[in-house]
């Protein structure tokens, strides 16, 4: 089902648009270390400005546990937005209350203000009706552009929609289009590349994508549980005992469906899990008993390259090795390059794989880099996201 977007709203002129963004950006000593999420909101903000809206931005930042805490103030975001938009973005000292409402009522067309962190109130995460109503008094129309928080049924993502006409912003529309398109009708061959450390956090995504994929590539720490389930020795590598049976059932089901599964057939290993460990190549499915699997090997990469070259659609979620350690990042880097050079539709979702694509400066060569970590994952699991549901036609 498609969502209503800003393009479906008749007129923004003179109206206060309460825009829920995802400005949950990383801060280092009070400075923003990565402004990707702020830039992602600009197209919606510019669109509303051009149409004479009075823009009231709302977001969370970090986990202040329902208490005011200057460490989690959105002030650095207001400063960065002022630079990016080339106009003063006024930072308000709160997100609800008569003083805040009066400030929004005195705005002129094209003005932009930012409310203080909604998570300074415990009621936000409880989706408290009274809090949502107070928040809604800052707008005449609600625009949700916070895909990264769409899997949370909070007051600022879901609750306010009970009190205001509600539409999605361009970022929300884009995420819904690309991730939804992959689940509904992918062009084939469709290759799913799923990495990450734990089967427990990725099995739902794997099961959701299995029936839709032609090929599933499994890498990262979770691959060792799959290898173990097939009878291979994995040394001291990560193993989730309670998921061995589930991994085995998954591989059996893939066989029944005629879906090719690529598991690591060679490895880069180390004596221990340490960034300074010496990498060693093992040309076998089996890992010696005193070694830990840390990355995929050259033969595995060749197998992946074969399927990526001919793919018409690729979804990649999760790194294929311990990419945060430089000595064990080559597998993930090579896969990032392969995905970037694929001529088909490519979507990268999930925090770590997005970080990998950014680390290797390849994001502009990917069709769509998802901004939602947990939200992307839940969407790909086939779950209904509350923040999207309230925007459906």
From Swiss-Prot:
ATP binds at residues 202, 293, 324, 350-353. Signal peptide: none annotated. It catalyses: (2R)-3-phosphoglycerate + ATP = (2R)-3-phospho-glyceroyl phosphate + ADP. One of its GO terms (cellular component) is cytosol. Its main location: cytoplasm. One of its GO terms (biological process) is gluconeogenesis. One of its GO terms (molecular function) is phosphoglycerate kinase activity. It is an enzyme of class 2 (transferase). Pathway: Carbohydrate degradation; glycolysis; pyruvate from D-glyceraldehyde 3-phosphate: step 2/5. It is found in: Cytoplasm. Its EC number is 2.7.2.3. Substrate binds at residues 22-24, 37, 60-63, 119, 152. Keywords: ATP-binding, Cytoplasm, Glycolysis, Kinase, Nucleotide-binding, Transferase. Belongs to the phosphoglycerate kinase family. PANTHER family: PHOSPHOGLYCERATE KINASE (PTHR11406), PHOSPHOGLYCERATE KINASE 1, CHLOROPLASTIC-RELATED (PTHR11406:SF23). Monomer. This is Phosphoglycerate kinase. It comes from Borreliella burgdorferi (strain ZS7) (Borrelia burgdorferi).
